[in-house]
Structures are given as structure tokens and as C-alpha cells.
Amino acid sequence: MTKAIIPQPRPGIMEISPYVGGESKLAGVDRIIKLSSNEGALGASPRVRDALIASAGEAHRYPDGNATALREALGRTHGLDPARIVCGAGSDELIGLLCRAYAGPGDSIVQSAYGFLMYGIYARGVGAEPILAPESDLTADIDAMLAAVRDTTKLVFLANPNNPTGTCLPTSEVVRLREGLRDDIILVVDAAYAEYVERNDYDAGARLVDSHPNTVMLRTFSKIGLGGLRLGWSYGPAHIIDVLNRVRGPFNICGQALVAGEAALADPAFTDLSRAHNSLWREWTRAKLQAMGIRVGESSGNFVLATFDAEGPFTALAADAALRQQGIICRRVAGYGLPNCLRITIGRDDEMQAVVEALGAFMAGEGR
């Protein structure tokens, strides 16, 4: 029997570690509390649900390939030029388009050490090298990022706020990064968690896009209840938006996602409610965990990062196992280089009370 020939991918592809999302099921457990994927705690706006039901009869129609109505709604909401907005199937797709359009073999991208994993995955996918700049106290270090830049660097990705650490830089530091880069390097400010930031010295990136060359802002609808519909958007200079429109697919966003996005933007009160809920329970959870002796830093996202002991009975793996026994799934972040941490999404009131109760029992040594 002739041995099957296995086609080989391009060099570097097999070096990619596949992205593993937050789990949603546990064997033998019926009631799951999923706090592993940073989804919106309150779900989607009622207007979104109504709009999806109303649009169900149009599922056989191709969507508007230019997302015209959604871009116009985004422009009205944020005071931006719709012509300089491009929408994608989540901001993930837009990260991939930027890498595909501007990087390739022999090139490099720069990101902070604990930045979003997809930057490196997409870079390797096009043959570019991801360079990780060291962080300071789990926070992007602008000096380290600038020092990591090479002649080959085409893109610099900054998640602000960052996932999974929750740390956030003031606008002045982001400006310092942009001004320290060569003009031909594209700075991508990934503001996926912008809705949850509560500080006066923060801008999601739109002003930087307008005031400095070759800067792109990424945003998403995933954190305000539309994660399952995969919808994100970017704002940038006209020449970069033109390039992204040339490399994206013709119908890259489904019609239901477009309708849902417009409905979400039309209900700012629900976004405000989601933000208030997140703020209350994020700080409540942080205080409760700190009182138990668990280290939890400040977070500007819809999650907290809990740090456990490196060894002994109170490790992150042991805490995770204890939570899973109660049907609670949080996010292990060893893949980010943080093996002693768990990322805990802010969920509903009862869910946060359950995770705090379970961790309290764990830290008290119950069940051991």
C-alpha cells in the first residue's frame, strides 16, 4: 500500500500554538457558571433580541458587504467619519487582516509580553516574527516596547486595557509610544474593553488616530453582549482602511450581526447599565479576594486576574480544581505565561457570590 503523502504547510505554521478559548462545559455537571470568556454579564440588550427576531426572515439574503448602516451608526455614536471605519467578524479578524496586509516573511511585530495571544498567532501565520516586550508589574512597558522594535518591525500591537491582566495605560503613555515609533510602523491600539474603563486619563484611541500618522484603533461588540455574533470594527487613516477593505472577504459579517450591532448602539442605556454592573461587582470581587489573601490587581476590564501561590496547597491549579468541583469555570492563563493566575470574568450577582464563596472555602482549607 502506498504511503499517503502529507502536504506540509509553510515554514513557521507548525510553530503556532492553537488558541484555546474559555471552556463552557464540565463532564457530569449540569449547572455551569461560566466565567472564562469575558462575555457581557447581562447578555444582549432587549433591543438586540427584538431586532434579531425581526430579521430572522432575511436569513437567506446576503448582507450588505460594506456594513454601511452599521458604520454610519458607529460614526454617529462616536463622532467618527464612517468612511474611515471597517467592520470585521470580531476584532480578531481585523488583527488578521492587518498582519496579512502589512507583514510577511522576514518582518516582525511587537507586543507586550502578556498581550492578547492572537497578535502572535496571526503574525506567525503570515511568516512574521512576534517579539514580546517585557512588562512591568503586569503592565505594558513603553520603554521596553520601543526597545524591542527592529528594522523589520511593521506593526506594534498595544491592548489597552490588556487581556488577561486588566491593566490600562493613560493616554499620555500611548502617545509616547506612537511618537517613539518610526512613522512607517503601524500602531494598533486594541481597545476591546474600552466600555469598562473608568479613568479620566484614558482615550480608546480615536484621538490618537486623528492626530498621529499610521495609527489604528480596534473595538468590539463582544464585551457588551454580542460575543456569539462576532462583530468588531476598526478606525484608522483612509489609506489603511482602503487596504483592509481590499483584503477582507466580500461578506465578512453576517446580516444578523449587522442588525444586532445597530440595535446595540441604539440602546446606550443598556451599555451604561452593563458598565455600572461590571464596576460594582468587579470591585466587590476584588475586595473579597484580597481579604482572603489572594493577590488581585486593579482591572479596567470586565474581569479580574487573581494570583495564587507558586507552590503549596494554594496554587492556581488547585483553586481551579476547587472551583470546577462547584461547576465554576474560570480561565487558566498559563498559555499567557501566567501559570500562577486565574482570570475571573465578572458575571451576574449570584455567579460572583458563588465564585467568592467557593474560593473562600478553598482558601480556608475546606475539602482538603
Curated annotation (Swiss-Prot):
Catalytic activity, reaction form: L-histidinol phosphate + 2-oxoglutarate = 3-(imidazol-4-yl)-2-oxopropyl phosphate + L-glutamate
Source organism, top-level taxon: Bacteria
EC code: 2.6.1.9
Necessary cofactors: pyridoxal 5'-phosphate
Entry keyword set: Amino-acid biosynthesis, Aminotransferase, Histidine biosynthesis, Pyridoxal phosphate, Transferase
PTM sites of type N6-(pyridoxal phosphate)lysine: 223
Molecular function as annotated in GO: histidinol-phosphate transaminase activity; pyridoxal phosphate binding
GO biological process, one term: L-histidine biosynthetic process
InterPro entries in the cross-refs: Aminotransferase_I/II_large, HisP_aminotrans, HistidinolP_aminotransfase, PyrdxlP-dep_Trfase, PyrdxlP-dep_Trfase_major, PyrdxlP-dep_Trfase_small
Pathway(s) where this gene product acts: Amino-acid biosynthesis; L-histidine biosynthesis; L-histidine from 5-phospho-alpha-D-ribose 1-diphosphate: step 7/9
Quaternary structure note: Homodimer.
Family: Belongs to the class-II pyridoxal-phosphate-dependent aminotransferase family. Histidinol-phosphate aminotransferase subfamily.
Name the record gives this protein: Histidinol-phosphate aminotransferase
Taxonomic source organism: Rhodospirillum rubrum (strain ATCC 11170 / ATH 1.1.1 / DSM 467 / LMG 4362 / NCIMB 8255 / S1)
